[in-house]
């Protein structure tokens, strides 16, 4: 059982000093070097930063080894870090800087030319490397390290007002999450982990910390690789992954390659999915292609430290339910389904809002007390969070029922878009899909289905559409069937590896 993230990671510098903790673009970082360089940075920060330790450190960059050195260096100086990926627009970076009010801006890559930082000290990449060299072999005071309920990291998520919200995750939150992942998912020492998500997306926490805590090797697939399918399909088998952590959409992208299978990836025996709904088709295809692998579906919002439920996906489970379960809650958490109107806890089998209670729940949004009070609350002495997700419990499993705010009204009918997508994914002719409402005069005019079709013998798109509609009529009411159909070979993905619904929406609502 881990009680201190830093102590456990640093211990590998003694046990396996030369083992690589990180491999990126031909460079290897050993556990010994990770400790030495993060110690050096921690010492530098303790000597040079005199502002309040409540102020976090922004770490800007992408996937270079300097990113995790900066993360751990910040922690050793007693400050939380805020990861900011270099793919973020300048306006977004400025919003995060303003909201976080950081003590320092560490840059592992060059800042955009049109971004000027004047009200906060900046440590650029050149000066960062210089600081690491000058403080070679210095060790920070271990009592200065982030501990217990101190903030460990702060990740900014989209806010309904357009301004990002900083979710505060403490050392205790991360310890709870990490112990659960390492135990329930049987992650042994020395495994190679895929890092698909940028560090500004909390899915990355699911590979970064379980990897470092178990003495493994983190192997990032950066934007230059994931944006080029030919490079991606070549790189995956070359990296000999043991553990796959990604969104389902990223796996769907890889499944387009017929060579993505056990034969070409013999070590790949664990798939961990989070961040999106895992479709039955995706899970079934992975079980066929990777007979030696175990597949886990997980669920959790950023506000509850990445994930709080898990279930191992089997062929029997796929056949047993209309959609895949999200699993069972982790041992130190409680999950309630509540009536959104009355707040009453609902019995199993009734649909309501998912409320999470316990050790994984964040203390709230940084410097946002009003927004915090809207969704976080105390439940019998435990921190609790209104997820805004709709769910139902059947046979002890949690099932996702869509977002409470992802409903539309069409011709008087209240419709959940995820409900339509889940039904479309049952159709044999559909591999993946996204439903986009077409707007007219401020209201929904019709539903547009963007579809990646399964291989078929139709020569005309209208023939394919007719066949899909005919199959849909068996289990979906007519008013829910999309009126327009757009066919694609692949979907655009966000930097986090999710379907880029904003881009699809712009395409439909030009």
From Swiss-Prot:
Its EC number is 6.2.1.54. Coiled coil: none annotated. It is an enzyme of class 6 (ligase). It is found in: Cytoplasm. Pfam families: AMP-binding (PF00501), AMP-binding_C (PF13193). GO terms for molecular function: ATP binding; D-alanine [D-alanyl carrier protein] ligase activity. ATP binds at residues 157-158, 297-302, 389, 498. Keywords: ATP-binding, Cytoplasm, Ligase, Nucleotide-binding. The keyword Cytoplasm applies. GO terms for biological process: lipoteichoic acid biosynthetic process. InterPro entries: AA_adenyl_dom, AMP-bd_C, AMP-bd_C_sf, AMP-binding_CS, AMP-dep_synth/lig_dom, ANL_N_sf, DltA, DltA-like. D-alanine binds at residues 202, 306, 498. It catalyses: holo-[D-alanyl-carrier protein] + D-alanine + ATP = D-alanyl-[D-alanyl-carrier protein] + AMP + diphosphate. GO terms for cellular component: cytoplasm. Pathway: Cell wall biogenesis; lipoteichoic acid biosynthesis. The keyword Oxidoreductase does not apply. Catalyzes the first step in the D-alanylation of lipoteichoic acid (LTA), the activation of D-alanine and its transfer onto the D-alanyl carrier protein (Dcp) DltC. In an ATP-dependent two-step reaction, forms a high energy D-alanyl-AMP intermediate, followed by transfer of the D-alanyl residue as a thiol ester to the phosphopantheinyl prosthetic group of the Dcp. D-alanylation of LTA plays an important role in modulating the properties of the cell wall in Gram-positive bacteria, influencing the net charge of the cell wall. PANTHER family: ENZYME, PUTATIVE (JCVI)-RELATED, PTHR45398. Belongs to the ATP-dependent AMP-binding enzyme family. DltA subfamily. This is D-alanine--D-alanyl carrier protein ligase. The gene is dltA.
